[in-house]
Amino acid sequence: STVVFVIPDIVKGGNQPTSHRKVAIRACLDELYAAGVEKKDVLLLFSNGLHPRATVPEMKTILGPELFQEFYPTGQITSHDSEDYKHLVDLGYTPQGDHVILNKYVYDADVAILIGHTQGNPYGGYSGGYKHCATGITHWRSISAHHVPQVMHRQDFVPVSTSSEMRHKFDQQGMYMEEKMGKKFFCCDAVLDTQNRQIEINSGWAKQMQPVSWKTADKRTYVHWAKKKYDVVVFGMPTKFHYGDGMGTNPIQMMQALSAQVIRHKRVLADRCVFIVSSICDGWFHEERW
């Protein structure tokens, strides 16, 4: 059997020796090898979606030296390329009209494993589950069905929730992929704390596993019971940013980051609250990457 691990990029999840990606991949490999899967039939695929493709140093940081050396020299680590049409499969349209174009490595594999994180996210409530495959291993046409004003300006987008139209689209696209592939994703998602440590790990079919993860994550992420509203928010904008260094000084990307904070904290913000944000603003926008 051939197996593809779908792994989040550098944006989320932590890189400590006990990070979810490092621990979960190794645990899954042990089970796969015990079941007769051969190492040569395993591929590690970073699910960067439309983010910059994972660099080799990022791959090594995320996986750790042991996993990296185990698979990289034999060409068994790669990063999703949303413009490489030789490695994309057009699955057609969901009943709701979303165009789904999927990574071919995932489509062709006998087993597709999503290693994900249940972390609070302004887009659809939480990362992980079907959000992982709908955003990480598709094409701009697929992503343009949900990361667009028609979805993000709806009344159900703010405050953040798992019942928004955006979340529904993630689920619809993910289940449509499963239907067309003829197999279900095996999801292994960790609910993480502020330091990216595992609080709880849930594995199985995303449709059944997501709500279980959300129940635990809700206890620390979205304080539905909060009553007090705040007038002022103060925070610093880092130069080193998880999407790429330089975002904290680029005014366009700064505004995107600010709007995400509004979405995240809307439940506890006064209607006319003020954001005070410090930034170096030294003019470095990291042009060599962006």
Task: Identify the meaning behind each predicted range.
Residues 68-229, 236-239, 257-262, 267:
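Conserved, well-structured core segments that form the ligand-binding/active-site neighborhood
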Residues 43-57, 82-87, 196:
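Short, conserved secondary-structure transition motifs
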Residues 14-37, 257-268:
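Histidine-anchored nucleotide/phosphate-binding helix
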Residues 2-16, 43-50, 234:
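Short glycine-rich or small-residue beta-strand-to-loop segments that form or flank ligand, phosphate
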Residues 36-49, 274-280:
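Short internal beta-strands
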Residues 246-290:
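C-terminal catalytic subdomain
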Residues 60-74, 286-290:
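Acidic, Ser/Thr-rich peripheral helices and adjacent loops at domain boundaries
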